[in-house]
Amino acid sequence: MILFGSTGSIGVNALKLAALKNIPISALACGDNIALLNEQIARFKPKFVAIKDSKNKHLVKHDRVFIGQEGLEQILTECQDKLLFNAIVGFAGLKSTLKAKELGKNIALANKESLVVAGSFLKGVKFLPVDSEHAALKFLLEGKKNIAKLYITASGGAFYRYKIKDLNQVSVKDALKHPNWNMGAKITIDSATMANKLFEIIEAYHLYDFKEIDALIEPRSLVHAMCEFKNGASTAYFSKADMKLAISDAIFEKQDTPILEAVDFSKMPALKFHPISTKKYPIFKLKNTFLKEPNLGVIINAANEVGVYNFLENKSGFLDIAKCIFKALDHFGVPKISSIEEVFEYDFKTREYLRS
């Protein structure tokens, strides 16, 4: 397995599971956490290593250290492994997904932005979704026909129990307190704004070629997806909130190893499902438009990344993230994209516009 994003939350869990099944790790790549990378190198002994910046190369305890995006693509070309586990955060992960597609590799995809911004250019790839909702949908949909509607669930994020009027005063520290999941900073903020759920709906559309998809808030994160059939029956996927289950589903050939303690239905508290309030989560207003116009993905994602970065750096408020997205959409409208090059152009133009 080739693992990009090895020092993040997903990457660390992927390595724990790889060790459980003695899956060889041929390559590791990370950003700036060189201390943890060196621990991983000592443990897993990869043939190739990549880091973001050449200034840290002398700190890496390995003979073959590649640098930046060019280095990632060199590793993909030289390494014979058929599986790329892409856990790079954000738009930065797209080029690696595209290169893996070109080389015919399977992709365990934690980088949902690849599909959000360029799903139409990634047809034919064998994706193994590293997301609790999409792993749940995969299980529920296997061999099934006559599907009427799909649902994925959201916890509501850090501010689910906050009043709308209090959201203009929340801090970064407040936003990073997710009630159920232990995740990286970017996705935790995306959960609080509901951008993450918007992206997951588009990801599900690209993975399963189905547009009748919605999301509901289930505050305990015990139900991850539901499938409604044309005859009125429905099925649901239950598990405790832990990404290791979705990761194991992507990288293990057989699902015969205990990963989590099962949900004890006799002790399970009452479950409630709630519609997502677009007053509280204005980004979610875009769901139907986005499903009709998937090309909007590059604008929405770039604007979201700018907004989240500004919030995390205390340059703007929490509510400004959504404002950033709507400002970009008002300016650019629906882009006409006919090539992957245009995806990169619109990403660049959106960021430039919002920074000007």
UniProtKB/Swiss-Prot annotation:
One MF annotation (Gene Ontology) recorded for this entry = 1-deoxy-D-xylulose-5-phosphate reductoisomerase activity
The record's EC number reads 1.1.1.267
Nucleus keyword on record: no
Query: Which enzyme type, at the first EC level?
Result: oxidoreductase
Q: Which cofactors does this protein require? A: Mg(2+); Mn(2+)
Amino-acid positions noted as binding Mn(2+) in the UniProt annotation, renumbered to this chain = 131, 133, 200
Keyword terms, alphabetized = Isoprene biosynthesis, Manganese, Metal-binding, NADP, Oxidoreductase
For this protein, what reaction is catalysed? 2-C-methyl-D-erythritol 4-phosphate + NADP(+) = 1-deoxy-D-xylulose 5-phosphate + NADPH + H(+)
Give the family this protein belongs to, as stated in its UniProt record: Belongs to the DXR family.
Specify the protein name.
1-deoxy-D-xylulose 5-phosphate reductoisomerase
Q: Which gene encodes it?
A: dxr
